[in-house]
């Protein structure tokens, strides 16, 4: 089982092509390409954390069918464009506004929005987010996992680390000694 992250798919969103300069001839072409890339990247046994803004402009039945057709066990970290009926779709394994995961020797905090500081930041944990569509300069150990930054497909922690050159932090913070006894 592999662990993947994505955000800001905006399936069905007519304005996404122009707002985010997506290179597709139509919304239908955009949706088809993202579905195909998701399903060639993710297997049925994999796990995917979607960090918000799943779909806009699709009815609830279409959203449910779309979610069901995407490979993997899917979790939603809600975004500003996820209405209550998206949060209630049966295809989500879990739904929450914030999550923390540990995998491949790394910890990560997950939210639709980027943080300036986050839990365990000093211990090397990552902040994975969406919302900014690749337009926000990241802090160290921070990454926008939105499809606009990752060829319209989910990504792994290894791919994120390779692009960002993030090194695993030591498991223990060094002890700092100063004259006068602090530390």
Task: Place the predicted regions along the sequence by residue.
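Active-site neighborhood of phospho(di)ester-bond hydrolases with catalytic His/Asp-centered motifs
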Residues: 6-7, 48-53, 74-80, 110-111, ...
């Amino acid at each position: 089982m592999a662990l993947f992250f994505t955000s800001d798919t905006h399936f069905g969103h007519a304005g996404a092509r122009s707002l985010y300069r997506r290179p597709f001839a139509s919304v239908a072409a955009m949706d088809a390409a993202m579905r195909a890339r998701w399903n060639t990247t993710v297997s049925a046994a994999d796990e995917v954390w979607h960090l918000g803004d799943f779909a806009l402009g699709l009815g609830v039945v279409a959203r449910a069918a779309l979610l069901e057709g995407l490979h993997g066990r899917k979790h939603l970290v809600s975004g500003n464009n996820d209405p209550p009926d998206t949060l209630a779709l049966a295809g989500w394994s879990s739904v929450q506004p914030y999550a923390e995961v540990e995998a491949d020797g790394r910890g990560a905090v997950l939210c639709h929005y980027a943080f300036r500081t986050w839990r365990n930041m000093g211990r090397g944990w990552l902040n994975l987010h969406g919302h900014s569509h690749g337009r926000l300069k990241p802090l160290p150990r921070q990454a926008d996992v939105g499809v606009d930054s990752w060829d319209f497909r989910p990504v792994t922690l290894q791919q994120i680390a390779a692009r960002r050159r993030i090194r695993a932090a030591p498991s223990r913070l060094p002890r700092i000694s100063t004259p006068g006894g602090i530390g």
